[in-house]
Amino acid sequence: MKLRVVILAAGKGTRMRSELPKVLHKVANKPMVEHVIDTARSLKPDAINLIYGHGGDQLKQAIAGDDLTWVEQREQLGTGHAVQQVIPHLKSSEKVIILYGDVPLLTESTLIKLVTASANTSLGLLTMTLAEPTGYGRIVRNERRSVTGIVEQKDANAQQLAINEVNTGIMIADSDKLKSWLEQLSNDNAQKEYYLTDIVAMAAREGINIATAQPDNAQEVEGANNRQQLASLERALQQRQAEELMTQGVTLIDPARFDCRGKLSAGSDVTIDINAVFEGNVVLGDRVVIEPNCVIRNSVIGDDTVIRANSHIEDAKVAKGCKVGPFARLRPGAELADEAQVGNFVEMKKSRLGKGSKASHLTYLGDTQVGEYANIGAGTITCNYDGVNKALTEIGDGAFIGSNSSLVAPVAIGKNATVGAGSVITRAVADEELAVARGKQRNISGWQRPQSKKGT
């Protein structure tokens, strides 16, 4: 049987107090609705319908995918009304899963449980059991434990309020039955809205066995209606990712102070200290050490490398046995070969540091290719930009660049060449040559400092 996923994403999110549609607020640096879409895609459905309303243009700009069919809900008249907009898209003999764009922690495994539980019936509900169910719609069952309906908190009697099995809103239904039930929905209630939950009682009256399944963790089905709940979801997702990494053998010095805002792959015996932030796709090799307060984005870090505190790495490749930082910045296109070292207040962009080479402090390397076992002295600057164009600096194997040197690109420093401290190099330096380009020192005997003129 074919599978369709319908995602409700039309809500304004007034309590967010934001111009941004609620579902575009981010958890782990990704819009909530994008988390939901990714989970839906993991099921490999035949179709995904995204129901939008408030901020539709913003939503379409932020979320892309050829597999998405956009369905507009011009008026927000309840969850049932939202799903009614999908009726023209429904095909016979489909299973239809209904999800919510502000419930980002739902997992593939939970949805598979729901699909499996409802395989032989026309309706399945994802429910959960709570010690404190206040605020949720209760799942009403008869003496045979069959689901007969859902009663909202405000409508429940004392006996129903004692029920601790609650509705999450997530369900799966046969398309033909769903269409029939949706067409029967009424807004004859105080809010004058069409409630999707009303189809449960319809199914029960038809004698349909309503299946149920529950998530492994109640946090999976929590939504965000305000900033506090958004922060709670953020911390819950970070804790989930931290648990997964520790299960795989990663040491997290404090899991409560860990942030992964993308995908992190780690080898064996990796250690991550506090307040490290990982964004995009990051790969850490075996025995990598990440010290406190580092930000690593879309980068690969090789085996036995140490990233010292307060370093920032983006779109970079760091090979085996390297040392980076503290307070180093590797910008896009930076590459370190095996055993290279970049120290404090060193910045690299579109540059490669060869095997065993060092730039230990206070250096800028832009559009630079450094060979093996070269030494870049403190304060070295590659002057790669003339105001219009960028130019390349080449530094050969074994070269030694003295402190406070400026290398004006395009320029090449040969193998085992030496540049004297304080030099401004504008022409090529041949292999094994010494280049000194600085003003001649002049010492003046008997010179006196200026004296203060009193009364002025």
Curated annotation (Swiss-Prot):
One MF annotation (Gene Ontology) recorded for this entry: glucosamine-1-phosphate N-acetyltransferase activity
Active site: residue positions: 361 (proton acceptor)
Gene3D superfamilies: Hexapeptide repeat proteins (2.160.10.10), Spore Coat Polysaccharide Biosynthesis Protein SpsA, Chain A (3.90.550.10)
Catalytic activity: alpha-D-glucosamine 1-phosphate + acetyl-CoA = N-acetyl-alpha-D-glucosamine 1-phosphate + CoA + H(+); N-acetyl-alpha-D-glucosamine 1-phosphate + UTP + H(+) = UDP-N-acetyl-alpha-D-glucosamine + diphosphate
Cofactor: Mg(2+)
EC number: 2.7.7.23, 2.3.1.157
Residues spanning the signal sequence: none
Binding site for Mg(2+): 102, 225
Principal cellular location given in the protein's record: cytoplasm
Disulfide pairings: none
Domain of life per record: Bacteria
Amino-acid positions noted as binding UDP-N-acetyl-alpha-D-glucosamine in the UniProt annotation, renumbered to this chain: 8-11, 22, 73, 78-79, 100-102, 137, 152, 167, 225, 331, 349, 364, 375
Sequence segments annotated as region (Pyrophosphorylase): 1-227
Pathway noted in the entry: Nucleotide-sugar biosynthesis; UDP-N-acetyl-alpha-D-glucosamine biosynthesis; N-acetyl-alpha-D-glucosamine 1-phosphate from alpha-D-glucosamine 6-phosphate (route II): step 2/2; Nucleotide-sugar biosynthesis; UDP-N-acetyl-alpha-D-glucosamine biosynthesis; UDP-N-acetyl-alpha-D-glucosamine from N-acetyl-alpha-D-glucosamine 1-phosphate: step 1/1; Bacterial outer membrane biogenesis; LPS lipid A biosynthesis
Entry GO CC: cytoplasm; membrane
Region described as N-acetyltransferase: 249-456
Subunit annotation: Homotrimer.
Family listed: In the N-terminal section; belongs to the N-acetylglucosamine-1-phosphate uridyltransferase family. In the C-terminal section; belongs to the transferase hexapeptide repeat family.
Protein function: Catalyzes the last two sequential reactions in the de novo biosynthetic pathway for UDP-N-acetylglucosamine (UDP-GlcNAc). The C-terminal domain catalyzes the transfer of acetyl group from acetyl coenzyme A to glucosamine-1-phosphate (GlcN-1-P) to produce N-acetylglucosamine-1-phosphate (GlcNAc-1-P), which is converted into UDP-GlcNAc by the transfer of uridine 5-monophosphate (from uridine 5-triphosphate), a reaction catalyzed by the N-terminal domain.
Name the UniProt record assigns to this protein: Bifunctional protein GlmU
Organism whose genome encodes this protein: Idiomarina loihiensis (strain ATCC BAA-735 / DSM 15497 / L2-TR)
Gene giving rise to this polypeptide: glmU
